[in-house]
Amino acid sequence: MKNNLPIKSRLLYKRLLSYVKPFWPVLLLGVLANILYSGIDAGFTYMTKLFLDKSFITIDLDFVKQIPLIVLIGITLRGLVSSLGSYCMTWVARSVVKVLRQTVFSHIIHLPADYYDEATSGQLLSKILYDVEQVAQVSADALTDFIQNICLVIGLLTVMMVICWQLSLMFLLTIPFVGIIVNYTNKRVRRISHKVQKTMGEVTEIASEAIEGYRVVRIFGGERYEITKFNKATEYSRKNDMKVAISKAINVSGVQLVIAIGIAMIIMAAIHLSTVITISAGSFLAIIAAMLQLIKPMKTLTTLNATIQRGLAGAESVFNLLDLPLERNNGLILKDKIRGEIEFKHVYHAYRQGQNILHDVNFVIEAGTSVALVGHSGSGKTTIASLLPRFYELSQGMITLDGMPIQQLSLESLRKQMSLVSQNVTLFNDTLANNIAYGRFDASREQIITAAKLAYADEFIKQLPDGYDTRVGENGVLLSGGQRQRIAIARAILKDAPILILDEATSALDSESEHYIQAALEQVMNGRTTLIIAHRLSTIKHAHKIIVMQHGRIVEQGSHQELLDMDGHYAQLYKVQQFGRVNEEVVV
């Protein structure tokens, strides 16, 4: 899934411009304002020649009297266009970032499940927050500074050429050397910027894991280990930042040295060629002033280069993500609910072209019946449950829904027919009502309460300070494990889909809660096609059919009693669990 091939700068610029294009009127206004700003600065430099020549050599009192007014108008206009240009460019940049960030988030939401298996939440957050923000610097700060300073450089060089083209040509000889320095630092900064972005992802990942798993960190005494790991990552980030700073310093000092040599050459030429080149004192000082003024914009442009390279590296990272293929989402759109007959035909599956996890799996779930998958960890139960809603695409074989291959159905239509309650409950930092109604945003409060009652969640919800309007915290941290599980079951009940997938749905409940939930689930499962994954065999006795998995293969299937009578794998598992449960009760 990963795509780390470098993208050429030209293509990056072109692709970035496609995001800027919708805002071109504001961008054009900002560019014109910045050009005018630079033109005023260059005009003031030319005014130096006129002021000196007409004030001290050929005295022109009328012109001298106009100087204060010219300066006042020029500085006022300069301030206005500077503010206008800055506002317009920032507006464009933030608009680009908004669109790009929304595009990245939408793309991540629709990436295949195997991408999430590889990428960490810290890496993804770094792309959404840090990498996209680097693009903002290219779109706003860097672009504004680039336009202002490149226009100022052109304006000052034009002034120099108008005043004395011979001396100006000597200064232009230094530009190729500036280009060599900039080109060298370009490559170095881009390379280091990629490392900086990778490091930021690692820093975010380490912090995210330590914060989310704070209970494990503390109970196992991992505070020092996590702090050391975080410190190493931040130190590595600091070193890379310092490498960028060194590159900037080399860039700036090198360019300043070249410009200083150019100024020295012009002064020497003006002294030694005074008999050949006729130039007034005002013209000579104006050229020197223009060259001195050139130092700042050229310094800014060379420093700006590092910002641009960081932004391009961020853009490359973002575009590499956007180039990843999305889930295949083509097929028929189902308008009505299906009956719910499921069939697996010669199904094989391997994750990322590795060894097969499933081997020639064949079974049928009749509409409205329940089938339980049992077996040791790693036997392929969860893989089967993940293939049904097409979280992963089949390697070989076919899965049908009412006789239709699921690959021929749109993802939205397919998943609309299913509800899922998994062992790892996901709750959002929102109200209990909104968590229950997730995916059914049009549900009424009465429907939400009914679902909660069926899941035996209504009683504890009413005891909370704000009832159904109580916020649950990040991933339901304010609720107990059993309470979170019941909210997830209520969510599945409210969706009222014809197919129900229960992946260890009662694993986090105490014995009393489990008893009530089992009773509720039996009512909810009535008339629905239900796929149950369970380790505790006592919870699936009443399933219409039980399928026993081992090493990705079906080794037995039948009802609870039929499998016990066979005295095979299932009977052994059942005896082991019953013996363990008896011992547990004796200990208690």
Curated annotation (Swiss-Prot):
CDD domains: ABC_6TM_MsbA_like. The chain crosses the membrane at residues 23-43, 56-76, 141-161, 162-182, 257-277, 278-298. Keywords: ATP-binding, Cell inner membrane, Cell membrane, Lipid transport, Membrane, Nucleotide-binding, Translocase, Transmembrane, Transmembrane helix, Transport. ATP binds at residues 375-382. It is found in: Cell inner membrane. Pfam families: ABC_membrane, ABC_tran. It is a multi-pass membrane protein. Its EC number is 7.5.2.6. One of its GO terms (molecular function) is ATP hydrolysis activity. It catalyses: ATP + H2O + lipid A-core oligosaccharideSide 1 = ADP + phosphate + lipid A-core oligosaccharideSide 2. GO terms for cellular component: plasma membrane. Residues 28-310 form the ABC transmembrane type-1 domain. Its main location: membrane. PROSITE patterns: ABC_TM1F, ABC_TRANSPORTER_1, ABC_TRANSPORTER_2, MSBA. Residues 342-576 form the ABC transporter domain. InterPro entries: AAA+_ATPase, ABC1_TM_dom, ABC1_TM_sf, ABC_transporter-like_ATP-bd, ABC_transporter-like_CS, ABC_transpr_lipidA, P-loop_NTPase, Type_1_exporter. The keyword Cell membrane applies. PANTHER family: ATP-BINDING CASSETTE SUB-FAMILY B MEMBER 10, MITOCHONDRIAL, ATP-DEPENDENT PERMEASE MDL1, MITOCHONDRIAL. In MsbA the ATP-binding domain (NBD) and the transmembrane domain (TMD) are fused. Homodimer. Involved in lipopolysaccharide (LPS) biosynthesis. Translocates lipid A-core from the inner to the outer leaflet of the inner membrane. Transmembrane domains (TMD) form a pore in the inner membrane and the ATP-binding domain (NBD) is responsible for energy generation. Belongs to the ABC transporter superfamily. Lipid exporter (TC 3.A.1.106) family. This is ATP-dependent lipid A-core flippase. It comes from Legionella pneumophila (strain Lens).
